[in-house]
């Protein structure tokens, strides 16, 4: 008999919340509108969701690929090609996603008399290595 660890339950919770986020804000359609679609192979939204989830699981892609429970169905080269693709307009993607989040969620929290402002900070920062 195997014991289900607390980490497994947390991973499932985080994974379901990430999926809910992608469905609620229709990240796939925004990615497609930003030229983030592929002609063959694994869907680009699946690769993007995988990269997005790595941040919240606090894991590296290398360790995730080496783990026994690997279920993503694509190789690291697919991820690298997706990230380095010159066709994807990342500025348009971040702007459209921010706009969708504001219009569907945040705008409802403010008074109608207030002026709406969208500030997207995409500055680069250095990480200690």
Regions from the PLM with identified roles:
Residues 1-129:
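Short alpha-helical elements
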């Amino acid at each position: 008999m195997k014991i289900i660890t607390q980490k497994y339950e947390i991973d499932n919770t985080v994974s379901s919340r990430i999926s809910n986020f992608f469905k609620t804000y229709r990240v796939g359609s925004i990615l497609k509108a930003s030229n983030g679609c592929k002609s063959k192979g694994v869907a680009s939204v699946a690769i993007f969701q995988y990269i997005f989830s790595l941040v919240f699981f606090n894991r590296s892609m290398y360790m995730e690929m080496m783990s026994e429970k690997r279920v993503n169905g694509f190789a690291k080269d697919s991820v690298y090609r997706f990230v380095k693709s010159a066709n994807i307009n990342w500025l348009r993607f971040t702007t459209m996603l921010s706009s969708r989040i504001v219009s569907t969620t945040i705008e409802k929290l403010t008074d109608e008399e207030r002026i709406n402002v969208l500030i997207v900070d995409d500055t680069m920062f250095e990480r200690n290595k």
